[in-house]
Amino acid sequence: MQSKANLEDLEFLRRLPKVSLHEHLDGCLRPHTVLELAREAGYGELPEQDPAALARWFFAGADRGSLPLYLEGFRHTIAVMQSAEALERVAYEYLEDCARDGVVYAEVRFAPHLHTAGLPHQGKPGLGLDSVMRAVLRGLERAGRDFDLGWGLIVCALRNENPDLSLKLAELAIAYREQGCVGFDLAGEEAGHPAAEHLKAFQFVKRQNFAITIHAGESFGPESIWQALQYCGAHRIGHGTRLIEDLAIHQGQVIKVGTLAQYLLDHRVPIEICLSSNVHTGAARSLSEHPFGLYKRLGYRLTLNTDNRLMSNTTLSEEYRLAVRHHGCDLDDLETLSINAMKSAFAHYDRRVEWIFERIKRPFAELRRQHGLPPRRPYASEAPQG
């Protein structure tokens, strides 16, 4: 197989076709774009005025072992994303950066209501929710066409906010399902803000036969994952690091699998893993201690993601490199991650099948041929599951 040294080569990893399912639009800005948008908006509160220094500031602020502290930097990115022009630009650049990193399909999420404050320094009123959605979708549509990428937009509600607002955002997501909105999410601090409080929003989404992903098991235990699945009907779980608490482990071996952990395994519930981010927020103690490796050995359907490229100073290729370095992933494992993600995407079934064969398996096979590598070994976990 491909040697570990080669698999840690970012240039090689960028050539691998990848699929991203868990990234926040307001956490994926380019540092120089933040500076330019701040100048245009008259926003003078950025802590640094040099792109490299600003990037270091965001990373230093995020890498503090706490989700609330990790989220502090978002007030700056959100502040400069208050005009239609800014939103369209950020969305376009997001997919452009995906293309440069070898991503062939990406789902990006954001909370539209956070972008309705306007530009008080210029006396400009805030955008309406529809204007926010249209601006982001315009940027994604243009970039998808320019860079030949598949994409989908996910609307986020926030756990700490009024459930009535969550219902309004769910209705907004459904209203744009034909324009590229593919799913609904619940994000934010889990402790003290159970997903069940937002049940009306999820009941509405389920009645509309729409897709659901929920941040769960990041800063709270298995109960949060259980609520996301059994109360709210989540089709995917964001992060899921604390699912490990439903596994009994002795001397590195799993001796008992709890009913929740077994449910996710049996039902092939995708888990959106974010290695770097989970260490930065304290959801995992270190990269090597992240449960990703254990989940992989047990056969869970895993996808690999960045969460927030700016805050965690990462790319999806870098996350693949970390999976190789800290969890022993080989080229077959990396291909499985891409296939799992495309299987789990909120795109229509026929499109997922086409992209798995044409945009993932075919390029991987060509890379193997170019490097004189043997064909990919079959994986039992890739039995047809839809």
Positions of PLM-derived features:
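Metal-cofactor-binding active-site regions of metalloenzymes
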Residues: 1-210, 218-236, 242-386
